[in-house]
Amino acid sequence: MARYSKKELIELEDKIVYKYKDNKLPFLFHLCGGNEEQLIKIFNQINDGDYVFVTHRNHYHAYLHGIDPDIVLDRVSNGRSMFLYDREKNFFSSAIVGGIPEIAAGVALALKNKGSNKKVWCFIGDGAEDTGHFYAAVRYVQSNKLPCQFIIEDNDISIEASKEDRWGSDYLFKWPECVTRYKYTLKYPHARIEEFCDLSIASKFKKTDKEYFPDLKKYPKIENIEEASSELSFNEAVTE
């Protein structure tokens, strides 16, 4: 369910821009911009409780999936722009290129095994589209008819290299129906914006993991890997 208009999304992202320009955001971040209409249309199909997996460029997705904008701004303001997540809303992100499709496929498998009516939505860039991890995840989802939809957010740029630069052509691979693609032009540079910010002040703003996750469970050091066991099975870790 899309919760914001195009204008509102831009205004929320502008708050991050203004904070950076005011020298109060000395961290790496990746701004969204130029794909508001496409994302609003997609999130109108996403239900509360559906699983959403996103890349390092994730602010719009977080807003549209119901994460409080103040929480997003707080996380971004403390250097966690690339790692936004909300376990209760089943929202996860990762900065590892091509690192989330296989996780999304695994969650979709667990949902199918549990008979859940929830669905997985996995957003990747056209750089991650080039990875073997994505190919394997797509093949597994398609072959097993899993409730997972991959969305390629294609701005024709992987960091600063176009498809032509990477492959010698701009040919688009033809994926099965579990993969959709939308094309857009990114409004901002790959990371940050083209203005100076004093990175030396980062320690004044950054919170510790203990401050963010006060109830984070501490696990004992594993001395013998053969004796190690997980408290939860994979299916138990995925809620219905």
Q: What spans do the regions from the language model cover?
A:
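Cofactor-binding active-site loop characterized by glycine-rich and histidine/acidic residues
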Residues: 17, 24-144, 168
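Conserved internal helical-beta-strand scaffold that buttresses enzyme catalytic cores
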Residues: 1-26, 35, 73-88, 196-236
